[in-house]
């Protein structure tokens, strides 16, 4: 089975670094029936007391309104791809090595496996790099 790769918009919001800081943002999206496929959150070491959460996807009028209400913004500097395929040893290494060989620098890469499938989200610096990465990954 070939890898499936697609462009995705990543949304980000600042969160309070305290109990409930993340859940407040996610509850706003959940109330609008936004079905998130990817969530990653972390502290902001350069801004004590805050963190950042990245999510995808957000769509539809209700989802977009909820995102705005919760302080989420589409990240114009993150050119993100969603990769899905069979889980097998070395899958992440194959993807990252192919991108490195093509001179594509990754801003970030997160992946997980469930059962016999894996899904990963990666970000690159430019639209051109994302288009190039899509072609490379689709051939793996």
Residue ranges and their predicted role:
Residues 1-140:
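A conserved regulatory-domain signal marking ACT and ACT-like small-molecule sensing domains
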């Amino acid at each position: 089975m070939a890898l499936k790769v697609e462009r995705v918009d990543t949304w980000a919001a600042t969160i309070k670094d305290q109990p409930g800081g993340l859940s407040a943002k996610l509850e706003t999206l959940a109330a609008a029936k936004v079905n998130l496929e990817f969530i990653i959150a972390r502290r902001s070491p350069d801004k004590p007391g805050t963190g950042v959460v990245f999510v995808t996807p957000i769509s539809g009028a209700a989802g977009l309104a909820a995102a705005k209400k919760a302080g989420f913004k589409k990240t114009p500097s993150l050119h993100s791809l969603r990769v899905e395929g069979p889980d097998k040893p070395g899958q992440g290494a194959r993807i990252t090595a192919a991108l490195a060989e093509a001179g594509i620098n990754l801003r970030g890469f997160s992946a997980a496996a469930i059962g016999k499938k894996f899904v990963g989200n990666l970000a690159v610096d430019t639209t051109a790099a994302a288009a190039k990465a899509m072609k490379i990954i689709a051939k793996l």
